[in-house]
Amino acid sequence: MGKYNLILSEYLSFIYNSQSAVQIPIYYSSNSELENRCIEFHSKCLENSKNGLSLKKLFAEYSDVIENATLLSILSYSYDKYNAVERKLVKYAKSKPLEADLTVNELDYENNKITSELFPTAEEYTDSLMDPAILTSLSSNLNAVMFWLEKHENDVAEKLKIYKRRLDLFTIVASTVNKYGVPRHNAKYRYEYEVMKDKPYYLVTWANSSIEMLMSVFSHEDYLIARELIVLSYSNRSTLAKLVSSPMSILVALVDINGTFITNEELELEFSNKYVRAIVPDQTFDELKQMLDNMRKAGLTDIPKMIQDWLVDCSIEKFPLMAKIYSWSFHVGFRKQKMLDAALDQLKTEYTEDVDDEMYREYTMLIRDEVVKMLEEPVKHDDHLLQDSELAGLLSMSSASNGESRQLKFGRKTIFSTKKNMHVMDDMANGRYTPGIIPPVNVNKPIPLGRRDVPGRRTRIIFILPYEYFIAQHAVVEKMLIYAKHTREYAEFYSQSNQLLSYGDVTRFLSNNSMVLYTDVSQWDSSQHNTQPFRKGIIMGLDMLANMTNDARVIQTLNLYKQTQINLMDSYVQIPDGNVIKKIQYGAVASGEKQTKAANSIANLALIKTVLSRISNKYSFATKIIRVDGDDNYAVLQFNTEVTKQMVQDVSNDVRETYARMNAKVKALVSTVGIEIAKRYIAGGKIFFRAGINLLNNEKRGQSTQWDQAAVLYSNYIVNRLRGFETDREFILTKIMQMTSVAITGSLRLFPSERVLTTNSTFKVFDSEDFIIEYGTTDDEVYIQRAFMSLSSQKSGIADEIAASSTFKNYVSRLSEQLLFSKNNIVSRGIALTEKAKLNSYAPISLEKRRAQISALLTMLQKPVTFKSSKITINDILRDIKPFFTVSEAHLSIQYQKFMPTLPDNVQYIIQCIGSRTYQIEDDGSKSAISRLISKYSVYRPSIEELYKVISLHENEIQLYLISLGIPKIDADTYVGSKIYSQDKYRILESYVYNLLSINYGCYQLFDFNSPDLEKLIRIPFKGKIPAVTFILHLYAKLEVINHAIKNGSWISLFCNYPKSEMIKLWKKMWNITSLRSPYTNANFFQD
């Protein structure tokens, strides 16, 4: 077993280093004789430790267990009072503590003052502005660093340099924290007033960020960047990240393109050796100089110097350092402002009458026309989704907050909850459910607010609207998104594309006679000037659409949608300010509606079109592409002459002047070679992503467990690593150890082993090898997987009680009745389960389940109990396949250029050998005929799991299933009797397997699985006609080959001789695969 278990036992002896501490390893085996020895070994260990005897003799006596069995967990005893952190910290606190400059930030509370100066009393205190919001503590983080330092103090050569760099930075953190004492956290990992009152308010979140940064230091440059950010972020809690990352928007315009990848007609990336010169007017250099001056004014020295040095020759070879600075800037932590300041930010923009009405008119008309274009077809054809919009809305209602806490009765149980789904049920039960009336959000019923915190930007507010708004908007927005899915302009929604496709789109048209205009419109989206024209454009579009149909229900859907827009034109918000709740009129657009993303995209597209139509009066150009992606839009303009400095400058100034005429405070830039938007940036013809995910601070608290957060931490580490920000893996593993350990009593703790945390079971947290998802096939691995499956889902008394109440039952049967035309148990049970799952977001239920889960886990980690299960996992399938493959050495040569310079070498190597893919593999079954047939007649959307179940039923059961969902009998008959049905079986199985194998996550999403270079390494003689079996054999082989290449940097070839007799057996097994949800899969999903 790997590195993890080794580090684990070293970590435990580091933490519990007193005489009274004992570590007892617990082993298990699938071999029953050995298993008995494991049990004996364990009980003797307990016996000896109770009597204070050494365990050394036992280790020798039971060497067979230690050598042949698998480590399950380590039990640690310690009667030590836990102030070890402070004692160890003193050793490192050797330098002068940092002193916060209390005048750096504009808002008083953003200065790092002593807590009692900001909050004189415990009543006034709030941790919301500095809450790390993660289920691990500062003391754990300090321990993890000190463990690493102690372990590496005898390193040599290059490793010694890394040690010294980190030691130096940790000295700063240790000295500062030590000056005030380590803040102790409470049971919920929060820092209370008593602990914080005599300490700087931002101490904890700053120390977490600093630890995250210093544990990501490898080179000397890393050290310089980290030191500067650590020192300055102690004082500057507001603008540091913004200052450091601002220059990037200009830097991307300075690098010549010498060879790049472009999207070809087949939507694949293809190398093009074109050369495009960066044409940069002096004005741009002046702006850059201004940015660097601002950085120096804020006390930065090394970082502006690095940028200045790079500017000498602006080479793409040295550009990764610029990318590094850009990524690092986000790791100073989240900027968390008070809600009042966040809201007022939008409202203090001056409202001027001096705007270009003609442009606004054009803008509104473009929005109107786009809305009409998107919805015209569904409206004219009286689409059933628009007819049954209310039901569709209910089925996809989330369990987020509805804005107010209510007292709800479920049977005999009375609970308080804010959750939408519970409010809907309660309203239905009490005759208060009126989806036809959209509640006003005016001064009488102001909107409660949520928040969104992001590093380097101001806090943004989010509307928490009543659920009626969701129901009214859901169906219409879904139709808009379907339109956007096949419209290239909407980069974010375009069908199954990933960011590589958008990259090739931009580079495609770059040449010496074109320029690209890129604009960050986030300020515009939330500005007051946008709100009237924006809502009016949508309303006008809806009015036009209402005249295209005679169907009363479609008209009603459109009218309700229109009503949400009318209500929101007169919106007030409620903001807690101290003890009072302030009501203010809020005239801007905020997130929180279902339409936010779609409507913003429409508006941003209309905006750039408006601007371009103005510019075209003065210049002659062809617009090659227009794209909008979230808060950004960009366009490539092709002129009929070669671009000159003067032209770039003129176009740039005219574009800015045009935006200014609409009073839009946006950042518009023009370049000939690159762009920078929130999601990605292109420089020198290569694509970069910001590696800015914080590891030790979180944006907000949810109801996830420590295990979930450990998995998210690992997942974040992987994403950052793929994007060029690497944190020490040993440190990440140490954090996982801390976060997955389970306390039994005050002095007893259980630490799961690597096998438990990496086997794909319901408890999986990380991969034993980065980027490689292993599916264990050895006896012990399958044994432990089975053991964990036996305790997968935990019951909750509260949830059962709610589900048994008439309120809940009536709601579920009401949904079923509206949806189904005849009895359909699969769907009814599915709805009931979905609704019951939504209850998990109610804290008491998730707590109850967590407790049950932990007690089951404790039993399991001390002695695994297996059960004979008929359930088959993907591991079983792969285990059956594996023996029939023979491996031989092979060779693939590098044949593609690099286009994503930040990738780790081993991942880069694979892309250079087999190529990349620009599309997401379909893994939800939505492309299958049955899925399309259902969505043609019903608002119900079956999951891939459900489709997988249904498609393997008998033909008459499939017919009944379809008919119950309202599909006409003739269509159902035709479907079952056709070839399409057998194609579907294969297609859905394929989707399901792709889904199970996480093929669209991690680094697998970058590889071209259909690469001919990969195919030629695999030889599988074609026997019998079972496409599903051939598919799984090929996919398994491809994953084996790729995993081997990631691990070893070399290629193997696989030959498979699969007996015909086994094929049918395998095929039958393939229809019974159980999918496993784990913290690990949730974290993958969470990345999405």
Swiss-Prot record:
Its cofactor is Mg(2+). It is found in: Virion. It is an enzyme of class 2 (transferase). GO terms for cellular component: virion component. Pfam families: RdRP_4, Rotavirus_VP1. InterPro entries: DNA/RNA_pol_sf, RNA-dir_pol_4-hel_dom, RNA-dir_pol_luteovirus, RNA-dir_pol_reovirus, Rotavirus_VP1_C. One of its GO terms (biological process) is DNA-templated transcription. Keywords: Magnesium, Nucleotide-binding, Nucleotidyltransferase, RNA-binding, RNA-directed RNA polymerase, Transferase, Viral RNA replication, Virion. It comes from the Viruses. The keyword RNA-binding applies. Its EC number is 2.7.7.48. The keyword Magnesium applies. Belongs to the reoviridae RNA-directed RNA polymerase family. Interacts with VP3 (Potential). Interacts with VP2; this interaction activates VP1. Interacts with NSP5; this interaction is probably necessary for the formation of functional virus factories. Interacts with NSP2; this interaction is weak. RNA-directed RNA polymerase that is involved in both transcription and genome replication. Together with VP3 capping enzyme, forms an enzyme complex positioned near the channels situated at each of the five-fold vertices of the core. Following infection, the outermost layer of the virus is lost, leaving a double-layered particle (DLP) made up of the core and VP6 shell. VP1 then catalyzes the transcription of fully conservative plus-strand genomic RNAs that are extruded through the DLP's channels into the cytoplasm where they function as mRNAs for translation of viral proteins. This is RNA-directed RNA polymerase. It comes from Rotavirus A (strain RVA/Cow/United States/NCDV-Lincoln/1969/G6P6[1]) (RV-A).
